[in-house]
A protein has these predicted regions:
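Hydrophobic or amphipathic, alpha-helical segments that drive membrane association/targeting
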Residues: 1-12, 37-47
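Catalytic zinc-binding patch centered on the HExxH motif and its immediate surroundings
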Residues: 40-62, 71
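Zn2+-dependent metallopeptidase catalytic core
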Residues: 12-35
């Protein structure tokens, strides 16, 4: 079973983050059941809104999301980083253009189906 652990931020941000991550797992990686995703909602000092890093194997991931983002941008950023999770989990090349292309589509689908 996939595990998602979220720390930092406010309770409503953690709840939103969990919901978006579980939604994107269903959309992007429906067959995987052994993902371990650790998310930290934190202040990111540069112009980036989020980061995704692979852990010890291609099933363990660390994501940082800027907690200062508004909800719309937070959902977009989470969707973007989850595309990178998909790329790493499937041993695909991490292509930024794919993440940028899929993030608005995933975010819109999330808002329409989950809210």
């Amino acid at each position: 079973m996939n595990t998602v652990e979220i720390s930092g931020g406010h309770k409503y941000q953690r709840k939103l983050c969990d919901s978006v991550i579980n939604y994107t797992i269903k959309k992007l990686l429906p067959r995987l059941r052994t993902l371990e995703i650790n998310v930290e909602l934190t202040n990111i000092p540069d112009d980036a809104t989020g980061y995704c890093m692979i852990g010890d194997n291609n099933r363990e991931f660390y994501i940082e999301i800027d907690k200062k983002l508004n909800l719309k941008d937070m959902v977009l950023t989470i969707c973007h980083e989850m595309v990178h999770v998909k790329q790493y989990a499937r041993n695909e090349k991490a292509i930024e253009s794919e993440a940028c292309c899929l993030e608005p589509k995933l975010a819109l689908e999330y808002w329409e189906k989950e809210n």
